[in-house]
Amino acid sequence: MVKRTGPTDINLRRLIRTLRKKSNEEGVKIWKDIAWRLERPRRQRAEVNISKINRYTKEGDVVIVPGSVLGAGRLEHKVVVAAWKFSEAARRKIIEAGGEAISIEELMERNPKGSGVIIME
């Protein structure tokens, strides 16, 4: 049996630690859930296309993706998307639609309680 080590990326480990700390400080479980989802192996981490974000959101929604946002599809309304990584095409399409592509840390600062945030995988 191989010992489970978790992510080796130092920045990701720091983010997971910060998410857990914020969860305990604020008494909110959403950040602990996001930390758990980011801790999974890379092959099991979320990869969400722009088309899926467009399909399941409406104008003004806030979405968090515990993984990567990819650029397939079109975005037809403004949304705020927070994710671990964005492809160049995805970031460009979100900004062209009038939305924002931000980091998970930035979303934690803006909305410490995590209210109204949609988790998308």
From Swiss-Prot:
This is Large ribosomal subunit protein eL18. Keywords: Ribonucleoprotein, Ribosomal protein. It comes from the Archaea. GO terms for molecular function: RNA binding; structural constituent of ribosome. GO terms for cellular component: cytosolic large ribosomal subunit. It comes from Thermococcus kodakarensis (strain ATCC BAA-918 / JCM 12380 / KOD1). Part of the 50S ribosomal subunit. NCBIfam families: PRK04005.1 (NF003079). HAMAP family: Ribosomal_eL18 (MF_00329). PANTHER family: 60S RIBOSOMAL PROTEIN L18 (PTHR10934), LARGE RIBOSOMAL SUBUNIT PROTEIN EL18 (PTHR10934:SF2). The keyword Ribonucleoprotein applies. Belongs to the eukaryotic ribosomal protein eL18 family. One of its GO terms (biological process) is translation.
